[in-house]
Curated annotation (Swiss-Prot):
Similarity remark: Belongs to the NDK family.
Top-level lineage group: Bacteria
GO biological process, one term: UTP biosynthetic process
Organism for this UniProt entry: Dehalococcoides mccartyi (strain ATCC BAA-2266 / KCTC 15142 / 195) (Dehalococcoides ethenogenes (strain 195))
GO cellular component, one term: cytoplasm
Catalytic activity: a 2'-deoxyribonucleoside 5'-diphosphate + ATP = a 2'-deoxyribonucleoside 5'-triphosphate + ADP; a ribonucleoside 5'-diphosphate + ATP = a ribonucleoside 5'-triphosphate + ADP
Protein's recorded name: Nucleoside diphosphate kinase
Quaternary structure annotation from Swiss-Prot or TrEMBL: Homotetramer.
Cofactor(s) required for function per UniProt: Mg(2+)
Keyword field: ATP-binding, Cytoplasm, Kinase, Magnesium, Metal-binding, Nucleotide metabolism, Nucleotide-binding, Phosphoprotein, Transferase
Functional summary from the UniProt entry: Major role in the synthesis of nucleoside triphosphates other than ATP. The ATP gamma phosphate is transferred to the NDP beta phosphate via a ping-pong mechanism, using a phosphorylated active-site intermediate.
Disordered: region residues: 87-106
Localization: Cytoplasm
């Protein structure tokens, strides 16, 4: 089974959208195996967004992601990364289809409500930043 990380960003948490977003992912047939709420600090943000460190928007991204609480969740299932990416929609909500999280709930390209792993390999790394293996729960979903 493939695992992937979902972050509900500060704009999503502040607008009370966490439950709706998590529910959308479960409706895809993905099983939530880890969940926590936290205030991301600059050190964790730097590690999480390290691939973007040299991009011009990096500083603004770190400022935004550390501006309020986030919800981190791990989902598991067949093709979990692909299913979640499709359900999230394009990075820019203005270019996202209706029916996707960003198309329905995103504000702008920065406040786009969610982050999701873009590959199974990156998911493993990202999950390890937010969860220890002992915090992930294996159970039979019925």
């Amino acid at each position: 089974m493939e695992r992937t990380l979902l972050l509900v960003k500060p704009d999503g948490v502040n607008r009370g959208l966490s439950g709706e977003i998590l529910g959308r992912m479960e409706k895809l047939g993905l099983k939530m195996i880890g969940l926590r709420m936290l205030q991301m600090d600059a050190v964790l943000a730097d590690k999480h967004y390290a691939p973007h460190r040299e991009r011009p928007f990096f500083k603004d991204l770190v400022t935004y992601i550390t501006s309020g609480p986030i919800v981190a969740a791990v989902f598991e299932g067949e093709n979990a990364v692909e299913k979640m990416r499709k359900a999230m929609g394009a990075t820019d909500p203005a270019k996202s289809e209706k029916g996707t999280v960003r198309g329905d709930l995103g504000i702008n390209i920065e406040q786009n409500t969610v982050h999701g792993s873009d590959s199974a390999e990156n998911a493993k790394h990202e999950i390890s930043l937010f969860f220890s293996e002992s915090e992930l729960v294996n159970y039979d979903r019925r």
